[in-house]
Every structure is written in structure tokens, then in C-alpha cells.
Amino acid sequence: MPAFNRLFPLASLVLIYWVSVCFPVCVEVPSETEAVQGNPMKLRCISCMKREEVEATTVVEWFYRPEGGKDFLIYEYRNGHQEVESPFQGRLQWNGSKDLQDVSITVLNVTLNDSGLYTCNVSREFEFEAHRPFVKTTRLIPLRVTEEAGEDFTSVVSEIMMYILLVFLTLWLLIEMIYCYRKVSKAEEAAQENASDYLAIPSENKENSAVPVEE
């Protein structure tokens, strides 16, 4: 099990790297919505662009709304990332990509008071020869912060399936070993019976059974 846990992430990283190199694509993956107190939490916000839309002016705004409160700005990217004055000041870290398709941020040292609704607004003005269209996308992330990490149902199911697979493989190997052992034993018994039958034949019969050689 530990070996599988070490090899599986490595194989996944190799596969992701190979796909990203051979087939450069953008996938809008939703953000996680649960965090543990004291740990960093990445708020994922991905807004993909088409290949012909690379030239664009992008502005990113992150808002936070506490439970029962109103939205207020906590982070802004406009010609460079900058943190605005807010209760999150000093705990926000830019985690986006150079092409600004991934505009995620990370909240450091998450507290229970960080629970609430996070809004990621991405505004783009594309630079075409004939026109300059403006597009705005919004991602909502309802975050819940807990004191301790809860049991992940997916990981529990995966672990159970892994144990079932190990038991199945063990039984299959045991059956194969028994089958091979019986097969070898039968072959040895047949060889011993043939040898015993040959030794039981009188010497006269052995000489008579020989094929005469013509001169």
C-alpha cells in the first residue's frame, strides 16, 4: 500500500506532464470547498481562453463575503498582482499562471473565520483588429473551514477497493499455485508409473520387444 501511494502520484505527474507538453489544453477544474484550520488553502479559479484569444488585457478581482455579510475586495490583479487592505492582508498569495488562464490565489494559515463565499471575477478585453470585445466570467467558491480534517469518503472507498483487490489477487495466486502443484504432481506420478511398468517387464520380454536389425 505505501509503495502504491508513492508510485501512483508519480505516474499521475508524469502523465499530466506528457499530456501538457504534447497536447497543451486548458481545463476549468472546480476549486475545493473545504479547508482545515492552520493549513494553506488554494482557491482555484480557471478561465480558459481560445487559442486565437491570447492577446487580451486581463483584470482579476477576488471578493469575500462572510456569512450574513456583504462582498468586499480582498485581492486584485491589474497590470500585476496586488493585495488590497482587508482582514486577509498578509495571508494571500498569488498562485496563477503567466497566461492568466489560471488566476488562483492561496490563503495562508486559514482560520475558522475564513469560512464564507469567495468570488473570482475575470474581466478580459480582447485585442482584435476590427473590434475589442469584453468578456467577464465569475466563479463562486463556498468555503467551509473545519478544526480537523474530516474523513474523505472517496479515499475511504478507494482504500476499501484496494484491499479487496489485494485479497482477490492473493486468492488468485493461491489457486494458481495449487493448480500448478497438482499438475506437476500428476506429471511426476505418471512418470513414476511408466518407470515402474517398464521395470516390471521381464528381461526376456524386453529383448523380444526390441526391433530386429536386418543384415
Curated annotation (Swiss-Prot):
Query: After translation, how is this protein modified?
Result: Intramolecular disulfide bonds favor the voltage-gated sodium channel oligomeric complex assembly. N-glycosylated.
Could you tell me the membrane topology recorded for this protein?
Single-pass type I membrane protein
TM ranges: 157-178
Q: Name one GO molecular function term.
A: sodium channel inhibitor activity
Where in the numbering of this chain does the Ig-like C2-type domain appear? Answer: 32-154
In which domain of life is the source organism classified?
Eukaryota
Record-given protein name: Sodium channel regulatory subunit beta-3
What organism is listed for this UniProt entry? Homo sapiens
